[in-house]
Amino acid sequence: MYSGAGPALAPPAPPPPIQGYAFKPPPRPDFGTSGRTIKLQANFFEMDIPKIDIYHYELDIKPEKCPRRVNREIVEHMVQHFKTQIFGDRKPVFDGRKNLYTAMPLPIGRDKVELEVTLPGEGKDRIFKVSIKWVSCVSLQALHDALSGRLPSVPFETIQALDVVMRHLPSMRYTPVGRSFFTASEGCSNPLGGGREVWFGFHQSVRPSLWKMMLNIDVSATAFYKAQPVIEFVCEVLDFKSIEEQQKPLTDSQRVKFTKEIKGLKVEITHCGQMKRKYRVCNVTRRPASHQTFPLQQESGQTVECTVAQYFKDRHKLVLRYPHLPCLQVGQEQKHTYLPLEVCNIVAGQRCIKKLTDNQTSTMIRATARSAPDRQEEISKLMRSASFNTDPYVREFGIMVKDEMTDVTGRVLQPPSILYGGRNKAIATPVQGVWDMRNKQFHTGIEIKVWAIACFAPQRQCTEVHLKSFTEQLRKISRDAGMPIQGQPCFCKYAQGADSVEPMFRHLKNTYAGLQLVVVILPGKTPVYAEVKRVGDTVLGMATQCVQMKNVQRTTPQTLSNLCLKINVKLGGVNNILLPQGRPPVFQQPVIFLGADVTHPPAGDGKKPSIAAVVGSMDAHPNRYCATVRVQQHRQEIIQDLAAMVRELLIQFYKSTRFKPTRIIFYRDGVSEGQFQQVLHHELLAIREACIKLEKDYQPGITFIVVQKRHHTRLFCTDKNERVGKSGNIPAGTTVDTKITHPTEFDFYLCSHAGIQGTSRPSHYHVLWDDNRFSSDELQILTYQLCHTYVRCTRSVSIPAPAYYAHLVAFRARYHLVDKEHDSAEGSHTSGQSNGRDHQALAKAVQVHQDTLRTMYFA
């Protein structure tokens, strides 16, 4: 079972002692050589850095907690005001919080200096106290030493300092968001609906690479709220043509929807002339402005209840046009400050952190997808307009940035051969990341004898004629694919609503012995889906396959074939395998592939738990996987219960194969650079603990690889003839491990998929630990081959199958958590802890039924 070609791997290195040990990522073993070379350009721009010292000062601004924008203004005023005494011609740069850097030391020595700065404000000036204290000298010489490999690690504080220098000017010109800068499009707006619009901008970060510092520049886009009157915002959110059609108070459901959208946003008032005070919305009143009262203190000192409408009439001589609409409650909840909608505007420049709707997402993608050559041109334009070499702050520190993208030599790896089954055991060879199943049969097809259909689409839209023809077509395609469906379904009925799912499924399970599959037909987006998965996966342990009504009304061989790919795997079949002779040497001994991911609830949802998922391969192909899943603390990135999860998977692997893995290859998704150290430390120890708990001398070699897709590295073909497809992307299998990668550590970029829309995003792999002493070629080829083992399609996908499956398992668990009385998977109206259920109840909700546990229910 475990035989493979090629040289044997070096034996795993003995693990170092566990206690008090800071794990260091391994050095790069070598550079890859496999594959044909390809000339590329990367959106990295070389920086020329002088070998000087930079002076780092700490600022303390009182009152604290001002937004960064205000802090920047304060510092700007301070530098102007104290020019003669302190700053002279120096141009300090500031990070908006506490850190200030100068190219020449300030004449204050080591002492703390206290200054007073006045900001002219609307109405009255604001006074701030600022203290400056010297922190350290940041040596750029040390950076040069690290980049050339003379120092073991890149000094973080130098990169931070350079980042602040490069961001200082753009931060004052644009709206910063994370590492990107945005501005509203001049002259043309890109509405998304619901009071939101697209803003375009650019990402910028300073990155160490081999021998050079690089500036990574990319175009980016994000959703902002439209600056508009709140009255117009209400119309957009609630789909009114105009406010005139809403002559009566909002209904409860309208108010809830509106509250959900506006809560937390800043508004400015329009009824006080030039004084446009800003407030944050904390709620929307239940009562309209004509009935909403608050305690008003009169001149006589006594307090009377007054309505908001009356107050505006008396105090501001303003008769409200829409007294029947509610008010915004602003500021602190306990303070009872109410503003009628009609005197408020949404403040410009607020980013939308709430989840976009499906329609908004597709509009966003349409507005932002750029073919690779277009994106390349846009990035070059950006560089010209940013013109860093004329930026006075960048020049102050003697930094120069090249205008051209960096040339990089990549390699296009050979795809693996894919082995099918049936009589002819056909072999497919992927071309551009895609292959075809025509005239091929599953490696191991399942025979389906007892199956049912439950149709939740209305009978008048999805008729019995549709169902009959769908069944015939599905049986034909499945027979060709080597997964014969014998006979008609044993049950075929219509049903309505999520409430009928459980009784119907119970009836099916009790009535039809040996029932293998329920095909469920859904009318578009519906809560029925979550309920089908909850009942099928967690309550009764039944295999379910959902199909959209439109794919039943009009079948195509492609959709039916894709359906078969999923069904065969859910029932325990194997669609195809990597050709055994073509696999890398790691397969010579038993090896388990683990994929892990943590998904977090959407931003703005303060209570829902995060979900951690780990999957493990269960055969030598590797094709079949088993899943484990846990709920954990909200937004917790480290997998808390990893030791127990890995232990479960190792036991399951042994049950399936009768082997103990001698190697564990762990692909970890969803970790950002800042968390590498933490995650590695906790999770590597957890994997080791899982092994030792099984047998005290069991020490398989562990390789820990972080997979990242959320980065801004983009690669472009230098030669137009190399471009692939309509969007002109790099070919599938393109790998880069020089020039733009880490100066000393083991990382690489691999674009394993064929880009269909927009510009391909290569995945970034960073090896944080490697007992198995992989060479670059071997790990890159292994990773690329695993991208071809994803069962849902006959294409190579953008990350290795185990990492992808972990993502699917976590995503499915979100559906298991849906509380059908209260919320939908998109986000609940109540922001309670998944509606007040405690940790135990949530943990139970994601627990998969015993019969489902060993199947690939998530496929």
UniProtKB/Swiss-Prot annotation:
Superkingdom field: Eukaryota
Regulation: Inhibited by EDTA.
Name of the protein described by the UniProt record: Protein argonaute-2
Swiss-Prot/TrEMBL keywords: Cytoplasm, Disease variant, Endonuclease, Host-virus interaction, Hydrolase, Hydroxylation, Intellectual disability, Magnesium, Manganese, Metal-binding, Nitration, Nuclease, Nucleus, Phosphoprotein, Repressor, Ribonucleoprotein, RNA-binding, RNA-mediated gene silencing, Transcription, Transcription regulation, Translation regulation, Ubl conjugation
Subcellular location: Cytoplasm, P-body; Nucleus
Source taxonomy: Eukaryota, Metazoa, Chordata, Craniata, Vertebrata
InterPro entries, A to Z: AGO2, ArgoL1, ArgoL2, Argonaute_Mid_dom, Argonaute_N, PAZ_dom, PAZ_dom_sf, Piwi
Effect of residue 192 to P: In LESKRES; impairs shRNA-mediated silencing. Does not affect targeting to P-bodies. Increases binding to mRNA targets. Does not affect interaction with DICER1. Decreased phosphorylation of the C-terminal serine cluster
Modified residues (3'-nitrotyrosine): 2
Gene of this entry: AGO2
